[in-house]
Regions:
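Cell-wall glycan-active module
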Residues: 1-47, 52-68, 73, 83-196
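Functionally critical loop-and-helix segments that line ligand-binding/catalytic clefts
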Residues: 79
Length: 196
């Protein structure tokens, strides 16, 4: 329905909660309240999430004192924060309830919907292995290496990276926004371009 491959959704749920085995055992209300009022560096963010949680509980008719999640208030199979739940959680099985805590069908649909709402394009590449053209001054100021690992969000374009000597086996539109990533491994560095 959303064009997101099952393997991607499965990977997210696997990484976040070991396929639902570790969804968190903290009361979400307690976690968010503590972080909102006792953690100054992120209090603005967590106050907003606490507000979103209270709205969620009211809208979904959920028991505020019983909902559990992570120490940071993330909930269910996909570890949605309250604002993400309100925007992206769906009732994928049609039973009238958006249950990401105990209903794997709703959780799967919600993760896929999250990707779709964030620009997932069915059939398009997610990443592409890249290489540096011989002669590229990778360590020079302004060279290709300075463009890698800048941000998880797109920070360059295929054309800009190509101009620095970065190539891919797959041809992409020059204007495609990418997030250049450099991974350090035993066998040497690997270069990748992450797409939106």
């Amino acid at each position: 329905k959303y064009g997101v491959p099952p393997g991607i959704v499965t990977a997210i749920i696997g990484v976040e909660t070991m396929y639902g085995r570790h969804k968190g055992n903290y009361r979400v209300l307690d976690a968010l309240t503590t972080l909102a009022f006792d953690y100054p560096p992120r209090s603005t963010f967590f106050k907003q999430e606490l507000r979103e949680f209270i709205l969620l509980v009211r809208e979904e008719n959920q028991p505020i004192m019983e909902l559990q999640g992570s120490y940071a208030g993330a909930m269910g199979y996909g570890q949605f924060i309250p604002s993400s739940y309100r925007r992206y959680a769906i009732d994928f099985d049609g039973d009238g309830i958006r249950d990401i805590w105990d209903n794997p069908t709703d959780a799967i649909g919600s993760v896929a919907n999250y990707f779709a709402e964030h620009g997932w394009q069915e059939g398009e590449a997610v990443v592409a292995k890249a290489s540096l053209r011989n002669g590229s001054k990778q360590d020079s100021i302004g060279g290709p290496d300075s463009k890698f690992n800048v941000s998880l969000k797109p920070s360059s374009t295929v054309g800009a990276m190509r101009a620095l000597g970065v190539t891919t086996l797959i041809e992409f539109d020059e204007t495609l926004e990418v997030s250049p990533m450099k991974l350090v491994g035993k066998e040497g560095d690997e270069y990748w371009l992450g797409m939106r």
